[in-house]
Curated annotation (Swiss-Prot):
This is Pyrimidine/purine nucleoside phosphorylase. The gene is ppnP. Signal peptide: none annotated. It catalyses: a purine D-ribonucleoside + phosphate = a purine nucleobase + alpha-D-ribose 1-phosphate; adenosine + phosphate = alpha-D-ribose 1-phosphate + adenine; cytidine + phosphate = cytosine + alpha-D-ribose 1-phosphate; guanosine + phosphate = alpha-D-ribose 1-phosphate + guanine. The keyword Glycosyltransferase applies. It comes from Sulfurovum sp. (strain NBC37-1). Catalyzes the phosphorolysis of diverse nucleosides, yielding D-ribose 1-phosphate and the respective free bases. Can use uridine, adenosine, guanosine, cytidine, thymidine, inosine and xanthosine as substrates. Also catalyzes the reverse reactions. GO terms for molecular function: guanosine phosphorylase activity; purine-nucleoside phosphorylase activity; thymidine phosphorylase activity; uridine phosphorylase activity. Belongs to the nucleoside phosphorylase PpnP family. It holds the Pfam family Ppnp. GO terms for cellular component: cytosol.
Length: 103
């Protein structure tokens, strides 16, 4: 199991889509941050400010990345990248845990 050490976790969570997607921000000593969260089954669209690496730790979803009309299947243990200043769509098939790194 992967774990982070010497970090600060923000107590207040981030909640989207009436609580169907939630996360907590993890701040690292070097100033970087990640969010750890989960998504309930459903369809969602997200916007990015910074580029992101989305690591799916468990669950299953389909993602449609910016500039593509193709849906990609992603399962626990897989990841995908999203460019800055863009939008992407997901269809979550079952409860999905994720780690989002801001690049």
């Amino acid at each position: 199991m992967k774990q982070f050490e010497n970090v600060n976790v923000e107590l207040e969570g981030n909640s989207y889509f009436d609580g169907a997607v939630t996360s907590r921000t993890v701040n690292f000593p070097d100033g970087s941050r990640k969010t750890l969260g989960f998504m309930l089954p459903g369809e969602y669209e997200f916007g990015t400010a910074a580029a992101e690496l989305m690591e799916i730790t468990s669950g299953e979803l389909d993602v449609k990345l910016p500039g593509s009309d193709e849906w990609l299947s992603i399962k626990g243990g897989e990841s995908f990248n999203v460019p800055a200043d863009s939008k992407f769509q997901v269809k979550v098939k079952r409860v999905t845990d994720y780690c989002c790194s801001y690049l």
